[in-house]
Amino acid sequence: MPKGPKQQPPEPEWIGDGESTSPTDKVVKKGKKDKKTKKTFFEELAVEDRQAGEEEKVLKEKEQQQQHQQQQQKKKRDTRKGRRKKDVDDDDGEEKELMERLKKLSVPASDEEEEAPAPVPRGGKKNKGGNVFAALIQDQSEEEEEEEKHPPKPAKPEKNRINKAVSQEQQPGPKGRKGKEEKSKGKAKPQNKFAALDDEEEQDEEEIKEKEPPKQGKEKAKKAEQMEYERQVASLKAANAAENDFSVSQAEMSSRQAMLENASDIKLEKFSISAHGKELFVNADLYIVAGRRYGLVGPNGKGKTTLLKHIANRALSIPPNIDVLLCEQEVVADETPAVQAVLRADTKRLKLLEEERRLQGQLEQGDDTAADRLEKVYEELRATGAAAAEAKARRILAGLGFDPEMQNRPTQKFSGGWRMRVSLARALFMEPTLLMLDEPTNHLDLNAVIWLNNYLQGWRKTLLIVSHDQGFLDDVCTDIIHLDAQRLHYYRGNYMTFKKMYQQKQKELLKQYEKQEKKLKELKAGGKSTKQAEKQTKEALTRKQQKCRRKNQDEESQEAPELLKRPKEYTVRFTFPDPPPLSPPVLGLHGVTFGYEGQKPLFKNLDFGIDMDSRICIVGPNGVGKSTLLLLLTGKLTPTRGEMRKNHRLKIGFFNQQYAEQLRMEETPTEYLQRGFNLPYQDARKCLGRFGLESHAHTIQICKLSGGQKARVVFAELACREPDVLILDEPTNNLDIESIDALGEAINEYKGAVIVVSHDARLITETNCQLWVVEEQSVSQIDGDFDDYKREVLEALGEVMVSRPRE
């Protein structure tokens, strides 16, 4: 007779009891003492029936123990049942095909087949029938039932554990235990999915047999194993059906989406942003905690505004429950009054008011069913503070410089700067979850900045501000985000705290760099080549950096370690040449009256003068004539009555808000200075460099420069004029913080007179300027310091000055 059975349909390999020359026969005979006589196919079926009866009793007891556990798992199965329904239908088709193939083989056994070894019954199966077809039908029903209870496990990762469980279940009783365990060693992995499912069912039943319910420790292990069992579903599903890839990925996305929908903070890791081929952010991380007020700082042109726009446009993964607003565009110019433009920003309030009017009309027509809904509408209106909405809108507009008449003026009658104020008022009125302000003080006068500063200190929601006003950042912000080297770095505290920490960090980096250079010199002096010395130093640096990362719990950089470079400090230095001494009177207005045609006079009988050591800051609300006063002093406006007097040798350097108008846009900055002052090429470039204009911008047409770069060209021009008096009208617009610091230092070092109009509180205080306020058609000096003036401004608006402790 043949040494092996005839070819069967794909089934798990099994070891028969017949004669065989394979090495596994020795293993089987070693553990089976009952294989002394050979049994026919039908005799073995009878033995199987008896074994099935015994197993059935044991399984009934097991089923009672499993019933409680199955009830707990029922809810989980129900949720997964719908998702697996399609897979089960596909599996049923495969099972039917397998059954058809098995039935074709179920013919009366031939002489050779009678001597062929019969398959060993699978452990844990209930063979109720008295023949092979009954056993197969029973197996099929159990497979279908088990597949509904548990999705199939992947066969490959669990190969060893499944084979062990199957070998232990093949025959009951301790008699053949050793032989069964050794038989499993020679057993191949299942050849199809149904065999794998059978093996997993046997494994589950064996685990239930070994882990009794009273043993709580084993119960916990069982639950943990079942959780792992469920996590492995995805891998098997992906291997069997392409559509399962979509469902699994969708489930994962749904889980992430659910987390986002409940998030109150923003956490974005490893994002990159490029603009016009230039990388602005590379593997940067953004963390914004709800309720904190962040200041985003860094040099101009590095991507601060770009980041705000990406957040506002939701180009980054912002949680959908966080409403984001970036105040960047002026309000539409139309017939809408300013106060109504602010009120209409709250669309929820408008919808509730519209519904209230509709329900009131239904009640008047006798429809009593609207009463309940109307009461709920009233509750929502009360909760949103609808009754106080107009008062709130007018308070915000007043703080930003709108008097009662201006609040009712149509927006089309305002200039662009005032429409920007209306837009800012709308943003403050709406109170979004995350409010982003990009240079909010640029279009404001000093009084409006004082009010906004005070108002935002009480802001309870999340705030992200880009500003060049250090005093504003110091008062408002609780955290600073520093954009440096295409990454975002976080510092707790206001700008002053950040500045101290950053300077200390730079000092430490400089010490490390100097230590590294010293080590390189020592290695070279000891006979090492430059390449060897750098390699050895780099290895030592790598170890030290890794130690620092572990200490600070920082993520390890993906970049290859490099030698330290000298820390580059972004420094800007403004310098104005000192003027020669001039005898007084230097510059003054005497009995001046002035007003624009068709308007009320701004000044009447004004007397105002300066000396060479004067440091004066002109303050006052918008529209009172601050810029007009500067134009009268420079001689660009002629008084209606009175006169302007000045020293005949006096040279005035004037920086106007509309400085771009004095530049020739078709020229390069170098050409502009060369033509105006007959300077050599290199001298012109040196002058531009002293005011922080990058070297590559020296030869670009002025029309292609940014606002900040154009401002530096104007400052360079002022220095070339060698003025005796500097008259500056809002000089900090478009300058970054470092440049404003440099301007303040230059003013302090300058020996001539300075008159400035500025909304930057820090520039005013650090230059020790005397405050002169324009009011009631005159100019007068203020008694007290800048804090006294702030208090006076807020009290006039009915506000209370906030004094926040420094963090």
Curated annotation (Swiss-Prot):
InterPro entries linked to this entry: AAA+_ATPase, ABC_transporter-like_ATP-bd, ABC_transporter-like_CS, ABCF_EF3_subfamily, P-loop_NTPase
Keyword Cytoplasm: yes
Gene Ontology CC terms, in alphabetical order: cytoplasm; nuclear envelope; nucleoplasm
Positions annotated to bind ATP 2: 620-627
Region (Disordered): 1-227, 521-564
Major location category of this protein: cytoplasm
Pfam family for this entry, one: ABC_tran
Bias kind Acidic residues: ranges: 197-207
Binding-site positions, ATP 1: 298-305
One MF term in the entry's GO annotations: ATP hydrolysis activity
Post-translational modification: Phosphorylated at phosphoserine and phosphothreonine. Phosphorylation on Ser-110 and Ser-141 by CK2; inhibits association of EIF2 with ribosomes.
Regions of compositional bias (Basic residues) in chain numbering: 29-39, 73-85
UniProt key word Nucleus: yes
Residues of the ABC transporter domain: 266-510, 587-802
PROSITE patterns cross-referenced by the UniProt entry: ABC_TRANSPORTER_1 (PS00211), ABC_TRANSPORTER_2 (PS50893)
UniProt KW keywords: Activator, ATP-binding, Cytoplasm, Nucleotide-binding, Nucleus, Phosphoprotein, Repeat
Composition bias, Basic and acidic residues: 47-65, 148-161, 208-227, 521-542
Compartments reported by the entry: Cytoplasm; Nucleus, Nucleoplasm; Nucleus envelope
GO biological process: positive regulation of translation; translational initiation
General function of this protein: Required for efficient Cap- and IRES-mediated mRNA translation initiation. Not involved in the ribosome biogenesis.
Oligomeric form and interacting partners: Interacts (via N-terminus) with EIF2S1; the interaction is independent of its phosphorylated status. Associates (via both ABC transporter domains) with the ribosomes.
Protein name as annotated: ATP-binding cassette sub-family F member 1
Source organism of this protein record: Sus scrofa
Gene transcribed to yield this protein: ABCF1
